[in-house]
């Protein structure tokens, strides 16, 4: 799974441990709770009447708390002529609300000493923050305002769009990043899995404030959303606070595209000026949940997971053919 962290502007692959499998709770009519004894030690879960699922792990030895809100609003859900919208929207969500200007919002987050950010991936959008444990209530209040009442001001949209367009140009100028985009597009031809999080210059330039709001209204709903908390916090108090802040939230996002591609073997070359050549090969990999998933993950790590991997030792150290070589996997594309 490829994820783009807007806080650090870096590309990384999410591990299986970071993934939360969502269960459809749109038909729930009452809240339900699961204690840590029914799950793993120190874990708890609560489902609110509106379908919002909350999970948590108490870690009393820590002085901080990290929480994240994951929504069923991924890159695959973007309209074909609005590629890059989810990335732009997740940046815009922090640019002021109906109750706080962008300056007020920024100052309040800074007063908390919060590290916050957003991520966009094929299947979801995620917002997260790390704060001192005794400031969780205030941080949740800010995030509720951000998610439920975004202002999406035009002036900030123009600035965020310019930043995203610059990032697109920068990515196209970096051969290593570009080759991953190219193999993804060729392997997943005519599938939402082929999309780039940043979109294209043409589509990003065309996205309007109304487009952002329409997508937010269509897909930012509690049913299918997961709120997770880990660190030094009181579970019961957190459940009560989340219920106060998000209890009036309603609705469910429409079903996402699920059609899988059927890639065919091919070879393609894109000439580019420069002294380096970049080669990438892509193969089918067992999906997360497949009986062979973990075995394939281990094999991939042995084959190309670091400086002790077989690829590194044979191709770089022994033969001196390359500067860098690696193997990796993405369980959902």
Would you name each region that the model predicts?
Residues 2-31, 43, 47, 55-58, ...:
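Charge-rich, well-structured scaffold segments of protease-associated domains
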Residues 57-59, 68-70, 254-309:
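His/Glu-based metal-binding/catalytic segments typifying zinc-dependent metallopeptidases
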């Amino acid at each position: 799974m490829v994820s783009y962290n807007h806080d650090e502007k870096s590309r990384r692959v999410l591990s299986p441990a970071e993934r939360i499998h969502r269960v459809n709770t749109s038909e729930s009519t009452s809240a339900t709770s699961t204690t840590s004894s029914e799950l793993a030690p120190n874990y708890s879960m609560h489902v609110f009447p509106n379908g919002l699922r909350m999970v948590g792990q108490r870690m009393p030895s820590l002085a901080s708390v990290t929480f994240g809100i994951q929504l069923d609003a991924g890159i695959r859900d973007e309209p074909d002529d609005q590629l890059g919208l989810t990335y732009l929207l997740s940046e815009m969500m922090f640019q002021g609300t109906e109750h706080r200007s962008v300056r007020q919002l920024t100052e309040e987050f800074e007063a908390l000493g919060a590290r916050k950010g957003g991520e966009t991936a094929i299947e979801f959008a995620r917002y997260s923050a790390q704060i001192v444990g005794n400031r969780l209530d205030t941080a949740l209040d800010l995030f509720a305002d951000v998610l439920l009442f975004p202002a999406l001001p035009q002036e900030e949209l123009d600035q965020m769009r310019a930043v995203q367009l610059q990032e697109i140009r920068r990515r196209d100028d970096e051969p290593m990043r570009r080759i991953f985009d190219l193999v993804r597009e060729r392997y997943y031809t005519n599938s939402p899995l082929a999309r780039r999080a940043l979109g294209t210059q043409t589509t990003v330039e065309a996205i309007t404030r109304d487009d952002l709001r329409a997508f937010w209204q269509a897909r930012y709903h509690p049913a299918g959303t997961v709120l997770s908390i880990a660190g030094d916090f009181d579970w019961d108090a957190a459940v009560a606070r989340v219920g106060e802040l998000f209890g009036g939230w309603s609705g469910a996002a429409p079903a996402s595209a699920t059609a899988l591609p059927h890639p065919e073997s091919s070879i393609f070359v894109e000439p580019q000026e420069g002294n380096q050549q970049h080669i990438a090969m892509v193969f089918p990999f067992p999906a997360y949940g497949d009986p062979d998933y973990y075995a394939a993950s281990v094999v991939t790590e042995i084959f190309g997971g670091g400086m002790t991997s077989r690829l590194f030792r044979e191709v770089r150290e022994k033969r001196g053919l390359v500067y860098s070589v690696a193997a990796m996997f993405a369980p959902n594309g």
